[in-house]
């Protein structure tokens, strides 16, 4: 009986049990860091795809706005020709026959004036990322087994911290790009409306001259 009691309290058995628990916890923690790394890598890939799509959308908006600007330029020339033709036909003596001066309006100056593309996003203050913080504190994990598994855990968490920092910068880039594109869309809408009104006015003026 005494021997069984002594065996049940054998320090070596307790140490082995503690080591077994430590190994189990380390294995579970290692697997968790692997899953974390996989998830942030998937998020990074999704962020890259989103930035690519935003870039392509931005190029399309640029082409659309360039088209609006070309129409505006063409209408300036058309209005000049109509005015010159009106002078030859003697139509300019009556104020009602004069073309409307669209360029004098505030809406025109807002989208075709100086700094029309000037959407300046505020620059956020620099924030220390997780990698820098961990480098200063000495690492991500508290070592227990101090073996290759904990080395991999540290490497995984270091990569996770790096990717999270990249995701943070991606999010800021997306926010700035979306804000810029929204402002550009607003300009395109105004330019489209003004071009339409300008074309309608020129058509009316040309009809009166016929």
From Swiss-Prot:
CDD domains: SNARE_SNAP25C, SNARE_SNAP25N
Coiled coil region boundaries: none
InterPro entries: SNAP-25_dom, SNAP-25_N_SNARE_chord, T_SNARE_dom
t-SNARE coiled-coil homology domain: residues covered: 23-85, 147-209
Subcellular location: Synapse, Synaptosome; Cell membrane
Highest taxon of the lineage: Eukaryota
Protein purpose: May play an important role in the synaptic function of specific neuronal systems. Associates with proteins involved in vesicle docking and membrane fusion.
GO MF term set: SNAP receptor activity; syntaxin-1 binding; voltage-gated potassium channel activity
An annotated GO BP: synaptic vesicle fusion to presynaptic active zone membrane
Annotated protein name in UniProt: Synaptosomal-associated protein 25
Keyword vocabulary terms for this entry: Cell membrane, Coiled coil, Membrane, Repeat, Synapse, Synaptosome
Gene name in the database record: snap25
One GO cellular component term noted in the UniProt record for this chain: cytoplasm
């Amino acid at each position: 009986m005494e021997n069984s009691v002594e065996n049940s309290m054998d320090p070596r058995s307790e140490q082995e049990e503690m080591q077994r628990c430590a190994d189990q916890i380390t294995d579970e923690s290692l697997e968790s860091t692997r899953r974390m790394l996989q998830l942030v890598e998937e998020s990074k890939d999704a962020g890259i795809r989103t930035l690519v799509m935003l870039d392509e959308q931005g190029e399309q908006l640029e082409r659309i706005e360039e088209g609006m600007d070309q129409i505006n330029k063409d209408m300036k020339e058309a209005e000049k020709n109509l005015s010159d033709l009106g002078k030859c036909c003697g139509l300019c003596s009556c104020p009602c026959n004069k073309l409307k001066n669209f360029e004098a309006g505030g809406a025109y100056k807002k989208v075709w004036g100086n700094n029309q593309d000037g959407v300046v996003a505020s620059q956020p203050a620099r924030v220390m990322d997780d990698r820098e913080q961990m480098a200063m504190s000495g690492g991500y994990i508290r070592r227990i087994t101090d073996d290759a598994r904990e080395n991999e855990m540290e490497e995984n968490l270091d990569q996770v911290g790096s990717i999270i920092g990249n995701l943070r910068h991606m999010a800021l880039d997306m926010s700035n790009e979306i804000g810029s594109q929204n402002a550009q869309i607003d300009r395109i809408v105004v330019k489209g409306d003004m071009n339409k009104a300008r074309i309608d006015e020129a058509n009316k003026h040309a009809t009166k001259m016929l």
